[in-house]
Amino acid sequence: MSKLAIFVGKKSILRKIRAHKSIGKEEARAVSKIMKTGNLSAFYGTWGEGFYGRKYVKRFEKSCNKYFKVKYAIAVNSWTSGLICAVGALDINPGDEIILPTWTMSACATSILAWNAIPVFADVNYEDYNINPKDVEKKITKKTKAIMAVDIFGHSAPIKELKKIAKKY
């Protein structure tokens, strides 16, 4: 039996994963301005003024509406909350399946489980660790309702290929 690389076995990945800078000066200035107010949240556990966010949150949501050309945009407190909202917006029913990559955060599978749906894991590509469209297609069943595309290490998921698969089924 071979030994894991961590225990002096042979390394299987010999290259470094590329770093990706995703926060620019404009974003840093905006966050700094809010941080200096000393109040990051207006939510105190119950309904009240600011329950849905104050001026910066509302301004952000409106800018998202305009940028993405959508009627609604909802700011959430975390990536996990956003995923739970996104899965809920899909009209997923208990027992439905959503395909997602094996290399991702636990919040992806948790957001599926929050709606009593079933996470189905597809392999990832060696080159960029994103979901492998060929394996996605192998995992599709009559219960499959969605494919969760996850960007990894600043590399975009193969959206075009995943869209083709989704339209096919």
Predicted feature descriptions by range:
Residues 1-80, 84-88, 114, 167:
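Conserved PLP-binding active-site segment in aminotransferase class I/II-type PLP enzymes
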Residues 88-169:
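PLP-dependent aminotransferase-like
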